[in-house]
A protein has these predicted regions:
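Extended beta-strand/beta-hairpin segments
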Residues: 1-65, 73-116
């Protein structure tokens, strides 16, 4: 394996079968568990507009979080290498998901607002 390649692995278990599987669109829960070895389990669901549990993280939350985290970590690394001392960092990120005619959707905008 190339030493520059980093592999990531997880197990995703759908836990939302209420007894009838996906026999109807309304009849199953969107709840699931993401398991990554050595880390706490992450219980997730769909966004409420897709019949998910509003108290759980959804893929859209996690995509926005991943973008914000990547920006933070890159910024901190660049500052450290340039001997710029960062004492605090907060990002108030927002994303816009546009629904498509077929019921799906796509992000059309992500705005990061870091405060250093």
């Amino acid at each position: 394996m190339n030493t520059n390649a980093h592999r990531y692995a997880l197990t995703l278990d759908w836990t939302g079968n209420r007894g009838a599987g996906t026999s109807t669109y309304e009849g199953y829960s969107r709840e699931h568990v993401v398991r990554i070895s050595g880390k706490p389990d992450l219980v997730g669901s769909a966004d409420p507009m897709f019949r998910g549990d509003p108290t759980l993280h959804n893929p859209e939350d996690l995509l926005l979080a991943a973008l914000s985290q990547c920006h933070l970590l890159t910024y901190l690394a660049l500052c450290a290498r340039a001997r710029i001392n960062v004492l605090s960092y907060r990002d108030r990120a927002e994303g816009t998901l546009m629904l498509t005619k077929d019921g799906g959707g796509q992000f059309t905008e992500v705005v990061l607002r870091p405060e250093v």
